[in-house]
Structure formats: C-alpha cells, structure tokens
C-alpha cells in the first residue's frame, strides 16, 4: 500500500511514454489568458507548417494536420471555447515570428487577444530582446503584419498595445429576418475579420454571464441568417471574405467604461475578452458614424468586465474603403504549461465536443 503521498506524487510526475509506445506524439504549449479568453500557444512538437505566407501555412495545417488542431482544441485537452496559436516562421523579413490562429471550428484571420498574449510572452521569455521599458514585437498573422508594443516595469510586461490592420465599415444599417428572433438590425465592419454588430437591448438581451447560452444561440442564428443573404468580399484577399462572428453591444453597468461587447464567433464560441479584432471594427464603425474623433480612447469591457482600450490613431484609404488604424491596449497572464500526448491507440485521440 502507498503510505507516502509525496513520494507517490513524484512518481506520477515522472510518468513518460514507454519506449515501445512510439505511437505517441508530444506537443508542448504555454497556457495564457487575455481578459479571461484562453490562448494555448503551441511551442513545439507540432509539424512544421509549409508555405511562404501565414495564410498558406494555415491552409497547410487545414489540409494536412487538422486532426491535431481538433486534438488540441477539443475535449479532453480543450473545450468548446478553446483558442490557440501555432508559432511559425515569419512571413516578412522585418517580423519576429508568425502565428496561425486555431479554434473549435478551424482557423481565424486575426486575433487581438492572442496578439496581446503572444507579445507579452515573447518579451518575457526572451524570444524578442527587451529594449528597455518599451519593446516592439512584430508578428505576421493571416490578415497581415501586426506591430505591438510591450510596456514593462521591473522586467515584467504590464500591458501591450498593438496597431491593427486597416479597419473599415463594410455595410451600415442592414437588417435580416432571423427564425425565432425576428427582424435584426446590424452593421458589418472589418478589424482583421468581418463581424456583424448588433445592439443587444434591441433583442431583449443582457450581456451578462447568466445569459451566455442565449447569447450563443442568438449569435449562431444571426450569423447563419446573414451568411446566405449578404455577400462579403475582402477588397484584397479572397481568403478573408467571410463573416467570422456576431458582436452584441450594450451599455455597461460600470460607468467608467464606454460599453460592453460580447462576441460569438466560429462555431458558437463566446469570447471572454472584449475581442481585439472586434473592438478594432467597432472603432472604425464609431468613427464612420462620427461618434468618436481620431485619438479619442474608449474602453470596452467583456462579459467578465475585463477591458480593452481602443482608439483610432490614423485615417487611411484601404482599397477604396475609408479606414482607420486602430490601436488596442490590454494585458495577458500566463497560467500554465502543457505537455499533450496524442496516442495513436487512443480511440478518442483527436478529441470530441459535446457542445
């Protein structure tokens, strides 16, 4: 009988696949969250993705290794709202590294919460050499090149700001009939991904944790109603021409912030953070509606009351669209390290989802 639990615990920790178990694949990760939204940074063990661009690398993953994406995002290693980033070689000579974003449905074009976590961990781990209290990190992502700044105190990154890609309004004051909901008014804006923006109060919704299931159900229905009726074409990159999610907007009970966001994206994922690409599209929308001016900072919070600050720092013309360059600020935290074993003999090796 085991008497010394401390010794037993050490032996548990020393478990390793046996030599004859060559069917094991080991993938390592750094576990983070930004405003409550998880980010699993895949650091090693994943096959090297091929392609000259990040979009090409994402396509290589989709075509050849999608089962590993499912294994890392789905239960039992993940859950229906899991999110990840696969670190890759940079696409451009002046970038530090690249990232392919993964989730429960597949792949995304931009992820602000991931950029914040990647920037913080890149500086604190020494992937990018610290240059004093402010360090620039340049990341290639599917929608383009992202410039981020890590602001440190006593060698600890306290917050991160990043400049998003040109963000613009794609369609204003649209409406669609949604089965079981009725007529829904919405705008579509792009902030690295296309979102439909909906006033929550117009549908009787409250942006609180107690309504998460209803928010997911409504977000899914609205997205599926919009997709067949509204064609979305990115002006320069066909692979970005899709509606990524629905963002519900409402006032916040916190008078110190501008408003609250809840983003339902991919296959019914609910973002715990305010959504970096989502607030980028929102600031473009507010600017187009003359509700804010350049360099006016607003703070947007999530369903958990975690917050991002965002402002439009510049106006640009992007492929015929009046666009702005958003600057988004937030913070992230490291909450663990992972070592994931994928055993070829396991009938559930590539995971499953019950929701």
UniProtKB/Swiss-Prot annotation:
The keyword Lyase applies. Optimum pH is 8.0-9.5. Substrate binds at residues 112-113, 276-277. The keyword Lyase applies. Catalyzes the dehydration of trans-3-hydroxy-L-proline (t3LHyp) to Delta(1)-pyrroline-2-carboxylate (Pyr2C). Together with LhpI, is involved in a metabolic pathway that converts t3LHyp to L-proline. Belongs to the proline racemase family. The gene is lhpH. Keywords: Lyase. GO terms for molecular function: 4-hydroxyproline epimerase activity; trans-L-3-hydroxyproline dehydratase activity. It comes from the Bacteria. Pfam families: Pro_racemase. Transmembrane segments: none annotated. Its EC number is 4.2.1.77. Homodimer. It comes from Colwellia psychrerythraea (strain 34H / ATCC BAA-681). This is Trans-3-hydroxy-L-proline dehydratase. It catalyses: trans-3-hydroxy-L-proline = 1-pyrroline-2-carboxylate + H2O. The active site is at residue 111.
């Amino acid at each position: 009988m085991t008497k010394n639990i401390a010794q037993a615990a050490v032996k548990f920790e020393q478990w390793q696949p046996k030599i004859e178990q060559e069917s094991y694949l080991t993938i390592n990760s750094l576990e983070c969250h930004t405003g409550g939204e998880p980010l699993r940074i895949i650091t090693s063990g994943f096959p090297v993705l091929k392609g000259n661009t990040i979009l090409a690398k994402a396509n290589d993953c989709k075509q050849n290794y999608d089962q590993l994406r499912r294994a890392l995002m789905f239960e039992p290693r993940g859950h229906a709202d899991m999110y990840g980033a696969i670190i890759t070689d940079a696409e451009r000579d002046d970038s530090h590294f690249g990232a392919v974003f993964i989730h429960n449905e597949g792949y995304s074009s931009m992820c602000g919460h991931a950029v914040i976590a990647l920037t913080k961990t890149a500086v604190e781990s020494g992937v990018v050499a610290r240059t004093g209290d402010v360090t620039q990190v340049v990341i290639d992502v599917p929608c383009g090149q992202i410039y981020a700044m890590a602001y440190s105190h006593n060698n600890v990154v306290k917050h991160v700001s990043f400049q998003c890609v040109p963000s613009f309004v794609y369609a204003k004051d649209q409406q669609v009939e949604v089965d079981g909901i009725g007529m829904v008014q919405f705008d579509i804006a792009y902030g690295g991904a296309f979102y439909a923006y909906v006033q929550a109060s117009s549908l009787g919704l409250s942006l609180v944790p107690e309504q998460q299931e209803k928010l997911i159900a409504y977000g899914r229905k609205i997205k599926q109603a919009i997709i067949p009726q509204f064609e979305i074409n990115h002006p320069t990159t066909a692979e970005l021409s899709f509606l990524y999610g629905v963002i519900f907007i409402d006032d916040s009970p916190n008078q110190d912030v501008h408003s609250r966001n809840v983003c339902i994206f991919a296959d019914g994922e609910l973002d715990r953070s305010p959504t970096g690409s989502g607030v980028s599209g929102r600031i473009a929308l507010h600017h187009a509606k003359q509700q804010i001016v350049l360099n006016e900072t607003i703070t947007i919070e999530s369903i958990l009351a975690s917050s991002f600050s965002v402002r439009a720092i510049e106006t640009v013309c992007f492929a015929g669209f009046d666009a702005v360059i958003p600057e988004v600020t937030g913070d992230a935290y490291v909450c663990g390290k992972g070592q994931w074993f994928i055993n070829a003999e396991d009938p559930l090796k590539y995971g499953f989802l019950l929701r």
